[in-house]
């Protein structure tokens, strides 16, 4: 079994957490939390990290086996199978939502005349091939994407800081505290980070000497910094009212800058940051779902499921919502509660295992 190192996992978690959130969920959280969005992201990051650590604690109970296999020893086979199907369904639902975000983004900004179905099929083919390549390929992709993102951010940050920002607004982050808005924003941000509980499903691929708590903390911290690096400038450039009504406030912020006559806009560079990172996230979600389904079906090789499951994700993404506004409303109003319910399921296993005592995650000796 090929293993993932600690540094690879940090990069993978960083890209996985920040990619979609920085690109598409900035506007919803600004609309919800206003100036309290920064605090909401920080609190959400801490709570989401606790969810991830709970999932990792369950995975450590049987480090050599997949959660889809050893979970039945904890709660029983007929309880475990419906729960693992729920979790696999959630991950595929999440992958479909992310893919729909990519489709809408490309259609609005770069491919307005291309049929959505064509874009979805091409994205699905990319995901299927990535999933078939295995977790090691996904981890190596994360390394490349991480350093490309880091390089572009280093290059673009000085240029973007040249845009006039309303720096007096910084005081509002402290003076405009609202408990209700902060709580609502925290509820919305927590599943952003809690989504990294996917590590539970790939734990056997991690090197055994990895200190998972330290890795998860660094992944959450790095992704939090990256998300805030998009969120704060968007707030200072447009204010909470206007930024909350924009579909892609970060894109509008970048478009407001011109560099002489040879680069009219920097938004293609932003696309370079978004799309590969999001495809990595979708691929990891599909991989985790496929590997779990393969174990439930007692398949020795998960690869035959890669194309069929990816095709299902493509079909669902096309019919996920009628338009971008409806998609944003779903992500703001309904998805956080649904996501938290799914992400908290591993905690049920943790409680049952603690009650049953040591060895609960291993088969009983005959």
Language model region names:
Residues 22-116, 125:
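Membrane helical hairpin/interfacial module
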Residues 92-95, 99, 131, 148-174, ...:
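Hydrophobic alpha-helical segments and their helix-loop junctions in multi-pass secondary transporters
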Residues 6-24, 40, 44, 87-91, ...:
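Hydrophobic, membrane-embedded alpha-helices of multi-pass small-molecule transporters
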Residues 31, 107, 124-145, 205-209, ...:
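Membrane-water interface regions at transmembrane-helix termini and the short interhelical loops
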Residues 42-54, 87-95, 127-128, 148-163, ...:
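Selective recognition of specific alpha-helical transmembrane segments in multi-pass small-molecule
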């Amino acid at each position: 079994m090929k293993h993932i190192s600690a540094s690879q996992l940090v990069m993978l978690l960083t890209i996985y957490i920040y990619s979609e959130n920085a690109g598409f969920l900035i506007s919803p959280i600004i609309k919800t939390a206003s100036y309290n969005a920064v605090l909401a992201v920080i609190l959400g990051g801490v709570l989401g990290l606790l969810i991830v650590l709970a999932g990792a604690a369950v995975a450590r109970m049987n480090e050599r086996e997949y959660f889809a296999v050893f979970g039945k020893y904890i709660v029983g086979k007929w309880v475990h199978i419906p729960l693992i199907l729920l979790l696999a369904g959630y991950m595929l639902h999440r992958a479909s939502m992310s893919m729909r975000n990519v489709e809408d983004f490309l259609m609005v900004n770069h491919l307005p005349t291309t049929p959505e179905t064509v874009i979805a099929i091409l994205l699905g083919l990319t995901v299927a091939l990535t999933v078939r390549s295995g977790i090691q390929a996904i981890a190596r992709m994360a390394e490349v994407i991480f350093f490309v993102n880091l390089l572009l951010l280093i290059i673009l940050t000085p240029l973007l800081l040249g845009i006039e920002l309303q720096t007096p607004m910084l005081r509002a982050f402290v003076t405009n505290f609202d408990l209700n808005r902060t709580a609502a924003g925290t509820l919305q941000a927590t599943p952003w980070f809690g989504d990294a509980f996917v590590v539970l499903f790939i734990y056997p691929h991690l090197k055994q000497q990895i200190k998972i708590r330290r890795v998860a903390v660094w992944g959450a911290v790095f992704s939090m910094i990256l998300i805030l690096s998009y969120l704060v400038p968007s707030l200072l450039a447009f204010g909470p009212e206007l930024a909350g009504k924009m579909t892609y406030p970060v894109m509008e912020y970048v478009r407001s800058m011109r560099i002489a006559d040879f680069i009219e806009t920097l938004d293609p560079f932003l696309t370079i940051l978004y799309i590969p990172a999001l495809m990595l996230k979708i691929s990891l979600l599909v991989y985790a779902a496929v590997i779990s389904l393969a174990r439930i079906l007692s398949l020795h090789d998960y690869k035959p499921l890669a194309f069929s499951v990816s095709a299902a994700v493509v079909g669902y993404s096309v019919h996920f919502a009628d338009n971008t506004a409806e998609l944003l409303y779903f992500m703001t109003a309904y998805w956080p509660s649904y996501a938290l319910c799914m992400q908290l399921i591993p905690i049920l296993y943790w409680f049952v295992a603690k009650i049953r005592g040591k060895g609960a995650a291993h088969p009983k000796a005959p």
